[in-house]
């Protein structure tokens, strides 16, 4: 993976910290690659979330990318994600979308019911997050969305794991998002061997 040179003291001092980073980030890249392989042959891509370790978001997202996954947003500055609490606070899907009309960044909205879905589509939503559906429900919703409006980006999330990923991908969604690829990835076992020259 890597070759480092330096004094014995500096190498041994940095060893554990460096290994911790490499093990953790390699675990993320590895599990992401497993998702990518599971989705092979579909048009669906795996996407990370903002559920990252404080201070390590950039590196963890880079590890997702290295594993073949795609990055969602890095923060509140590069995309808006309207979740159920935002809809409740705004009063309706329409009102929440209206508040973000001139955001200058992509706007994605989570819809929980068919009524919210229709309201989102009627009010110009182009990026939809469908959360906590079964694979059968996901297929039904994706088919409906594609029949009503072309060009909508559809993301599925909530309760999706590596074992169920393929069934969700076969719904025709554009993305599956999973916080588990960053927050629950098992570290890869990597060691450090010192040689003296």
What are these regions (language model features)?
Residues 191-197:
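Active-site loop ensemble at the mouth of alpha/beta enzyme cores that anchors a bound cofactor
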Residues 162:
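Cys/His-rich Zn2+-binding cysteine-cluster or related metal-binding knuckle/ribbon modules and their
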Residues 1-123, 127, 133-144, 152-155, ...:
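Acidic/glycine-rich phosphate/pyrophosphate-binding loops and surrounding catalytic core
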């Amino acid at each position: 993976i890597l070759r480092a040179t330096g004094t014995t003291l500096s190498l041994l001092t940095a060893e554990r910290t460096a290994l911790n980073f490499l093990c953790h980030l390699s675990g993320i890249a590895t599990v992401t690659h497993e998702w990518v392989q599971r989705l092979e042959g579909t048009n669906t891509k795996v996407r990370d979330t903002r559920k990252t370790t404080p201070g390590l978001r950039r590196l963890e997202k880079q590890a997702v990318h290295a594993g073949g996954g795609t990055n969602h947003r890095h923060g509140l500055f590069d995309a808006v994600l309207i979740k159920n609490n935002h809809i409740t606070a705004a009063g309706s899907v329409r009102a929440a979308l209206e508040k973000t009309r001139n955001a200058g960044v992509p706007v994605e909205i989570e819809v929980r019911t068919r009524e919210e879905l229709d309201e989102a589509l009627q009010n110009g939503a182009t990026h939809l997050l469908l959360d906590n559906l079964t694979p059968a429900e996901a297929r039904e919703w994706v088919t409906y969305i594609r029949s009503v409006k072309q060009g909508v980006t559809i993301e599925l999330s909530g309760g999706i794991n590596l074992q169920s990923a393929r069934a969700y991908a076969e719904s025709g969604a554009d993305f599956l998002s999973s916080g588990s690829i960053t927050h629950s990835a098992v570290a890869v076992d990597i060691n450090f061997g010192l040689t003296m020259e």
